[in-house]
Amino acid sequence: MAIHPKVKDIIVEQLGVDPDKVKAEASFIDDLGADSLDIVELVMAMEEEFDLEIPDEDAEKLKTVQDVASYLEKKGKA
C-alpha cells in the first residue's frame, strides 16, 4: 500500500527526519526517534490535516507509518 504523500510530509515535518526513512514499516519510536510528545504532536497534525478526531485509545495503537496509513484509509481519509 502506498503511503499517502500528506502523511509522509507531516511525519517528515513533525519529526524532522529524512524522507527516505519514512517507510511503511518504520516505527515512530524505534526507527524515527520519536518520543511520546512527538507522537501527540503527530496525531494532532494528522487530525488537523485530515479533519478528523483520533481518540486516545486509537492513537495509542498507531506505532508505525503503516498503522497511520491504514487508520486513515479505514476512516476514508487517505
UniProtKB/Swiss-Prot annotation:
One of its GO terms (cellular component) is cytosol. The keyword Lipid metabolism applies. The keyword Disulfide bond does not apply. InterPro entries: ACP (IPR003231), ACP-like_sf (IPR036736), PP-bd_ACP (IPR009081), Ppantetheine_attach_site (IPR006162). Its main location: cytoplasm. It is found in: Cytoplasm. Pathway: Lipid metabolism; fatty acid biosynthesis. Carrier of the growing fatty acid chain in fatty acid biosynthesis. Belongs to the acyl carrier protein (ACP) family. This is Acyl carrier protein.
